[in-house]
Amino acid sequence: MSWIEDIISPQTRKWEEFYRNRWQYDKIVRSTHGVNCTGGCSWAIHVKDGVVVWEMQQLDYPQFNKEVPPYEPRGCQRGISYSWYLYSPIRVKYPIMRGALLDLFNKEKQACGGDPVEAWAKLQADPVKRARYQRARGKGGFRRVKWDEALELIAASNIYTIQKYGSDRIIGFAPIPAKSMLSYASGARYLQLMGGVNLSFYDWYCDLPNAFPEIWGEQTDVCESADWYKSKFIVSMGANLGMTRTPDIHFFSEARHNGTKTVVMSPDFSMVAKHADQWIPAHAGSDGAFWMAVTHVILKEYHIDRQVPYFMDYTKRFTDCPFLVKLEEKDGIVLPGRMMRISEVSQFDGAENGEWKFLNIDAKTGNLVSPMGTSGYRWQDEKGKWNLNFNDGETGVEYDPELTFLEKHDDVMQVEFVEYGLDKKALRGVPVRYITTKDGQKVPVATIYDLTMAQYGLGRGLEGEYPTSYEDKNAAYTPAWQEIFTGIGSKTVLQFAREWASTAETTEGACMVIVGAAINHWFHGNLMYRASIMAQMLTGCNGKNGGGMNHYVGQEKLAPMDSWSTIMSSKDWGTAPRLQQGPIWHYINSSQWRYDGNQKFYNSAPDNELANMHTADWAVKAVRNG
């Protein structure tokens, strides 16, 4: 029975004191982790003598909406071990400087009687010494220095640069402000007060989804994770939610228990795939091909064979499908051109911002109308007309936009479309009408909807090089065509497209795509986004609870934006902030442009101004244009 004596004997239980002392705490502090994470989880930080001893998830989140599950539990493995980062022996908690630079600077400073600015100037004037510390880059050799030493060298180099080149040659970069608003603002304010330049960040490391400003004119406007529960069809595309959205993954699982179909598109069976009803292992970078085939099926079965009223109304009201595009002939080939402006027709002669207002046709009268949702109405003097109401912005008359000229057209023109995947071109029939411009010319125009039908290979009885069926591999964008790129069978595409569209029809748009930085980091990743968004728009999913395109990366938003930006950019001193787009700055100054050619080297696009200029030429042109 000696083991009983061991249990009750105080002498044999002293080891317990080690654990009691390890987990003792003086107080509990509520906090979160500023690690560029959108989780924003609330943590109970247990502190002893000013040192974090352990962390625990808070359990007091308010349940403000009983239609969705509670937000708890929130947290992740990274969060609960965050104190290990704080007290890690490899965490750098002090300034370090390359020994080669430190020795050279101190020697010059001593020779200059202690003047740091003169010392830096002499160091820069000596090419041999300058090259010595430059060649040391990438080879280690760091030494710990005092804060005063580091700050003195930074200040001296800044003053020298201002005196010799001007303050706008001092460039600063930091990751996204929401990661640490105070840290970012202090550095940015320092730069702005002396005329320096801040580089952009969100776009530089490819977190900003370019498709969003291209389509909607905003940066990243997505739903919060609780809205996943209201969806009835979720596609996780290039987003490993179990790893990158750990505090929110429970909404994904709970939505599935609530009857939501969950699909994961990923080359590998990732952490999130185990939460899904279906795993689609498309080849990396082929998501766009898959979605274009899905849209082909949606247009065929839900816009042509059967016109779903909700889809048709949404397409008219919330997309640019009714807008008119001029068709232009070049070397005997007809190509889609620019959208037609109201300034080009005499009916709207003298309209303010006419170059930024575009045309629809009223389905009832056949008259030209000017929709109010365009940029021209946003910036004109008369306010209150920048909306999506079906009223002519110039006359106020109600109208019903014409989506297609299929039943009422003046002509059918063979228009050339380019398919870059297989480097092919096709001539396809497009119904057109003729509009007489101010100068008396008759210009053929087509709706974006009709051009989209032709682009996606839907003939609707028109002549041209259209696919013969879903199984036609030689014509974009059939289910069989996408097999070449994705490795996914056409039957999977058909099932997916029909389930997506049927769910969107029944729920009026409660189908969503969750996407992460993986696809956004691909060359032309914006086109993969847009391929998916196309299917969403044509089934009325964007702007709906439980629907739309939801791109999650870091913490791109901060609450006190207006007041914070005043401090950050030193607007309180009356200065105009100097800001520079990060990608272009690095593209030019790192000589990356030297490795690119003209756009026409990479695709079979027709010769035009865009294709015949280098990206660097366009960057220079943008600067010249202000």
Regions found by a protein language model. Give the residues of each.
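Short, contiguous, pocket-lining structural segments
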Residues: 444, 485-488, 527
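A glycine-rich, hydrophobic/aromatic-adjacent loop/helix-cap motif
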Residues: 466, 473-474, 480, 492, ...
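N-terminal export/assembly segments and adjacent metallocofactor-ligating motifs
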Residues: 1-443, 450-461, 468, 477-480, ...
